[in-house]
Amino acid sequence: MGFRLAHLAACVARAAASSSRLRGPRPAASALVAPLLASPWEPSGGGQPHWLVPSRGHVGHSHHHHHGEEVGGEASERIFRLGLAADVVLTVGKAVTGYLSGSTAIAADAAHSLSDIVLSGVALLSYKAAKAPRDKEHPYGHGKFESLGALGISSMLLVTAGGIAWHAFDVLQGVMSSAPDIIGNVSHAHHSHGSSGHHHGIDLEHPILALSVTAFAISVKEGLYWITKRAGEKEGSGLMKANAWHHRSDAISSVVALLGVGGSILGVPYLDPLAGLVVSGMILKAGVHTGYESVLELVDAAVDPSLLQPIKETILQVDGVKGCHRLRGRKAGTSLYLDVHIEVYPFLSVSAAHDIGETVRHQIQKSHNQVAEVFIHIGSLQPLNQNAL
């Protein structure tokens, strides 16, 4: 009896093995249930919906995005350092030239360049602070330090403009009240009284020195303007753009100083203090403009619509997005923070709608490097909006 039972068990085992080979491997339970759970909007051929992206795609892109910011930040920092070094050289050159030639305009420009050293230092420190990584106390980063630095620069520009205007007006008043035959001597004696008691008339033996240094300053500052301007536009840095226009204002003020030197050499001394007044006016304008832009960023003013329109076009080009509204943004230094409402088909699954939102985020940060973060609210397409789309 035991032999028969063992023989029967062996036969059953061989039959089961043979049946398994004929049928092949049994499908997994998830494979049987998946077709029943598929969204009616997903393709039936088994392919991935064309609006979906792998979840790792956003993480990988985020790493690449920050790496690009790091490389661009190093290049921008070098530009700030270059501007600081140039300001030191120009300040020394203008101060020596103003001392030798006795030109009020060049002396005023030297004082302006001295303030430029401080301003360039503040700009560099503000930029480095703004590029510090996020931490627990600053979850949105340190971008506002750029705006604070620009506001500090504007305040110092206003003070510098006031000091130069006061000195130039004082000299001009002395020139206008002097007798015509001694107008040159009196004006420069008055200027020397404000310069620690040293008398500096217009030294006609050094006109070439005065003109050469001024022309050199114009060339250097104009070159710094273009370098800084292009870097600021590429990175979207308001601080760099303001610093670029500051370099441009320095170049123009040097042109005015050049006119003042020429007027003094030609025997028209009142052009010298008038040039100083024009320089102070240009510095005043730069300070007001920089301060206004900085305050707008600090109070989270609305971003220019011309900056948001390309981003909206990028959103509407994403497959699955059927509408876009309430696109808003605020700036924090070089970074732009956005929030937007998008509309999708009402019968999509939650995961499909989420993947569309991730695709929108991916495309925005891919096409617009200045965007640091996007908050996306996903809603269903309303029947009233279908005809409009």
From Swiss-Prot:
A Pfam family of this chain: Cation_efflux
Described purpose of this protein according to its UniProt entry: Involved in sequestration of excess metal in the cytoplasm into vacuoles to maintain metal homeostasis.
Domain of life: Eukaryota
Bilayer disposition of the protein: Multi-pass membrane protein
InterPro entries the record matches: Cation_efflux (IPR002524), Cation_efflux_CTD (IPR027470), Cation_efflux_CTD_sf (IPR036837), Cation_efflux_TMD_sf (IPR027469), CDF_Transporter (IPR050291)
Record's protein name: Metal tolerance protein 2
Localization: Vacuole membrane
Protein family (similarity comment): Belongs to the cation diffusion facilitator (CDF) transporter (TC 2.A.4) family. SLC30A subfamily.
PANTHER family: MITOCHONDRIAL METAL TRANSPORTER 1-RELATED
Main location: membrane
Cytoplasmic topological segments: 1-81, 126-148, 228-250, 297-389
A Gene Ontology cellular-component term: membrane
Sequence intervals crossing the membrane: 82-102, 105-125, 149-169, 207-227, 251-271, 276-296
UniProt keyword annotations, A-Z: Ion transport, Membrane, Transmembrane, Transmembrane helix, Transport, Vacuole
Membrane topology, Vacuolar segments: 103-104, 170-206, 272-275
Recorded GO MF terms: monoatomic cation transmembrane transporter activity
